[in-house]
């Protein structure tokens, strides 16, 4: 079975991205310093900053004790338990009673006392490694499993190499370890993965909260005060365990999406469950009930995923030819792959995938009008603008291009927005169920943005700037699908809209990030301005559907 690379190898893959981020920061500081004073002393300061940047890069690249950005964050300690979350509106379930959870044993029963003693036996022989494991998982179940999902996406975001005859092999979910390994987690695949996992986690936790208040069984440390408590304490009932619920639902969804990584996924699941018992947060029956609940909810989402038409998104030669012919029939120049040999377009039928936030007719209505005609003056002007941006690029613009590139080997643009959201959610001390609700709103927006975006790309099948003007040398890789509309812009518009609703104080910052992500594609020579501006608008229109759901889901 496939195993993820070791942590230091993972960070080695991410090092160029980290350097780009740091370079971007240095450039911002440089600009500020030059604006204040242009003299030799200031130049020395700038040189010093650059030396520091190089030194830090060297330390990162050589250290064998590299830590993740969130490895040392405090334990989740919610400012509110959201005790009434069992009444919140689920995504797929009709209500929490769709899943039955058995009545727990009483806390004074011999069975429960034996489970308390199991915790004590573990705590009597704790190792340093076990303490660290508890600390890691105490940061939050939704956060950690989102990070695991992002890592899996990055691992599998590698396009297959061509066959000897010039054709391209297709990953096979039924034989995931054969080359090319399944999946190729490109942006639309990734957006769908984030959407399904987050929505399923949310429904599972809403159901868990319903049964927590129904049975109201206290946490073990509330029953036996002699237990060592290694996590933040709470008045929230512990049955079923919210962490185990997230384990159960996440494992089943990830097994569907990443079938070749089941050994790694199960390893993380066992580690997570053990951490909750060792920490004194849950007895074993809390864990077992939670995991079973999570798995039951996951099966509802697995059934939906198997029928959402994503399996046909790759299309076939007949469909690919039809898209070209329809474009030429309109008098336009169809998109062509720039790879040698030509690679089929990336998931051209993804626009037919079943969305979460609206129906298929609404999806069609969200598709924007056509791009500028290839022979129009507007297109000539926009093409020239792309060329001028590339040949007159600056270090700052180049850093922006790389910061937002999110290409091969990364967790894709949707994963980048998940990371942005997670960093902000950590500071908010949300409960697990509110974490799940907010991530579901974000990731359903990103998934549905991908659907509308890809429907638009296939509808117009417009060429990339580099196809119309080979003199344009892009600053990052050219994606293998049509230009209009920009995927980065659409994802970013959707993310900024819903995140700005969730955290209004950050709305202007999210919009600024979305604008920068969008413009990065123009700076890099990958998109015309109309691809970017229209993509942002479409994304925000999609995000507004998530906002409509948010104001009616009972959580506000």
Language model regions located:
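Acidic/polar surface patches and capping/hinge elements
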Residues: 63-556
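Hydrophobic helical h-region of N-terminal Sec-dependent signal peptides
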Residues: 51-56
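C-terminal motif of bacterial Sec signal peptides marking the signal peptidase cleavage site
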Residues: 58-61
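Cationic, low-complexity basic patches in intrinsically disordered or flexible, solvent-exposed regions
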Residues: 14-15, 32-33
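Ala/Thr-enriched low-complexity intrinsically disordered regions
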Residues: 2, 7-12, 23
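Positively charged n-region of N-terminal signal peptides that target proteins for export
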Residues: 42-45
């Amino acid at each position: 079975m496939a195993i993820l690379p070791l942590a230091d190898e993972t960070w080695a893959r991410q090092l160029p991205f980290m350097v780009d981020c740091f370079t971007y920061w240095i450039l911002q500081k440089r600009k500020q310093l030059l604006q204040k004073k242009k003299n030799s002393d200031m130049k020395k300061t700038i040189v010093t900053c650059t030396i520091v940047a190089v030194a830090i890069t060297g330390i990162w690249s050589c250290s064998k004790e590299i830590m993740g950005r969130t490895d040392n964050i405090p334990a989740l300690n919610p400012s509110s338990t959201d005790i009434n979350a069992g009444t919140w509106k689920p995504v797929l379930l009709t209500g929490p009673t769709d899943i039955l959870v058995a009545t727990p044993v009483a806390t004074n029963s011999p069975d429960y006392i034996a489970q308390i003693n199991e915790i004590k036996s573990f705590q009597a022989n704790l190792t340093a490694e076990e303490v660290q494991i508890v600390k890691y998982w105490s940061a939050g179940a939704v956060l950690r499993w989102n990070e695991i999902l992002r890592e899996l996406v990055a691992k599998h975001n590698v396009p297959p190499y061509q066959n000897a005859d010039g054709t391209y092999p297709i990953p096979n979910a039924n034989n995931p370890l054969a080359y090319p390994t399944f999946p190729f987690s490109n942006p639309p695949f990734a957006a769908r993965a984030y959407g399904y996992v987050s929505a399923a986690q949310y429904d599972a936790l809403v159901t868990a909260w319903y049964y927590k208040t129904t049975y109201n069984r206290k946490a073990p440390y509330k029953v036996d005060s002699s237990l060592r408590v290694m996590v933040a304490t709470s008045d929230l009932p512990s049955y079923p365990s919210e962490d185990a619920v997230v384990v159960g639902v996440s494992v089943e969804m990830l097994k569907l999406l990443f079938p070749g990584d089941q050994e790694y996924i199960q390893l993380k699941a066992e580690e997570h469950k053990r951490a909750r018992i060792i920490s004194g947060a849950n007895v074993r029956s809390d864990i077992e009930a939670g995991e079973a609940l999570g798995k039951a909810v996951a099966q509802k989402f697995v059934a939906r995923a198997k029928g959402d038409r994503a399996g046909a998104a790759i299309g076939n030669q007949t469909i690919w030819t039809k898209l070209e012919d329809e474009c030429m029939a309109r008098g336009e120049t169809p998109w062509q792959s720039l790879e040698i040999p030509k690679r089929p377009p990336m998931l051209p039928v993804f626009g037919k995938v079943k969305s979460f936030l609206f129906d298929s007719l609404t999806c069609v209505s969200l598709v924007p009008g056509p791009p500028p005609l290839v022979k129009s003056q507007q297109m000539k002007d926009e093409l020239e603008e792309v060329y001028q941006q590339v040949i007159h690029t600056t270090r700052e613009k180049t850093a922006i291009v790389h910061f937002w590139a999110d290409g091969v080997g990364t967790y894709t643009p949707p994963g980048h927005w998940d990371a942005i959201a997670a960093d902000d959610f950590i500071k908010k001390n949300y409960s697990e169920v509110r974490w799940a609700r907010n991530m579901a709103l974000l990731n359903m927006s990103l998934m549905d943005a991908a659907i509308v975006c890809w429907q638009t790309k296939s509808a117009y099948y417009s060429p990339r700037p580099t196809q119309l003007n080979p003199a344009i040398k892009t600053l990052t890789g050219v994606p293998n699908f049509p230009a209009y509309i920009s995927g980065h812009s659409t994802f970013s518009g959707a993310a900024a809209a819903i995140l700005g609703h969730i955290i209004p104080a950050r709305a202007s910052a999210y919009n600024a990030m979305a604008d920068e992500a969008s413009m990065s594609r123009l700076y890099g020579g990958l998109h015309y301005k109309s691809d970017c501006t229209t993509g942002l608008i479409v994304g925000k229109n999609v995000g507004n559907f998530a906002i409509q759901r948010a104001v009616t889901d009972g959580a506000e």
